[in-house]
Every structure is written in structure tokens, then in C-alpha cells.
Amino acid sequence: PSTPPLEDHSFDIAASLSALDDFGPVDKGTSTGGAVDVEAVFAKFKEGVRQQVAETDAQSHYDLGVAYKEMGLINDALTEFELASRDPSRECVCHSMAGMMHLEQGNLEAAIEAFIRGLHAEQKSADQELALYYELGNTYQLRSNPREALFYFQKVMRRDAGYRDVAARVR
């Protein structure tokens, strides 16, 4: 007996982008000089995404998070990473990504919270844990909390003294 072929339920970003062609022509008589309303285009794109991607499709939500991050759509990226983090195998990396975005925005408290959530993920590798300890040390250092920074940098040192510039940071 043959097994039925697996259905591909993954999100097709290219198809969704091509659906934007249905957005309609731009009214050349508007004061925008024929420019497309980018926010309206993205709103249509995101609506198409919501219709096509199940909340449980962690891979697609992760991929969308990465794409939105690269486009500078930080809030949308954070939402997608939060949805993708419901998959235990992606929880750590999603919280790490969220922490890095918060850090880039200068939101140190949110970065710390995200990194700690990553540490609490049940499924994480030793490398992921090491990176989170380092990022927590770095974030506490940026927050002018040298004691807490040293605590996390020392955790990194005990596991891998050659990790990044941790030896210099502990001195």
C-alpha cells in the first residue's frame, strides 16, 4: 500500500506578493504624484498572510518574522516571532530574535525579558544558551549594571573562555 503524498501547507510568500498585483491601478490624479501607498500595500499583503497561514504554522511565522525584520517592520516581526515561539523547537531562537530587535531599538528591559524567556525554553542547545548568557551580559552592561553583566559573562567564561570577547569583558 502506498502512502498518500504529503500536502504542502507552507506559506507561499511569492504567491502572496503576486496577489498584490490585484491591488489595482494607482490614480494618477492624486497629489502623491502616482506613488503607491506602501502602508496600504503592506496591509493587503498582511491580510493575505492572515488568510493563508495557520497560527500553528511555526515555520511560516518564523520566516515571516525574519522577512518583516529585514524590511524594518519590527512590530510585525515581533508578532510573528511570538506566534512561532509556540513551537517548543523554535521557542528559544524566536525569543533570541525578539531580544536582538529590542536591543537594536534601545529597549533594554524588553531585550532582557526576551533573552530570559529564551533561557526558559525547554528545547535549546548549549550554543543557544551560551549566546543568551552573553547577550544578557552585554545588555546589562549597556544598562550600566556591571554586577549583573559580570554574572552572565562569568557564566559564559566557565563554559567557553574563548567565546567572542568575553575574556576581555570579564577583566
Label the predicted regions.
Residues 85-86, 120, 157-158:
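Conserved structural position within tetratricopeptide repeats
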Residues 1-79, 89-91, 100, 105:
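Intrinsically disordered, low-complexity acidic segments enriched in Asp/Glu and Pro
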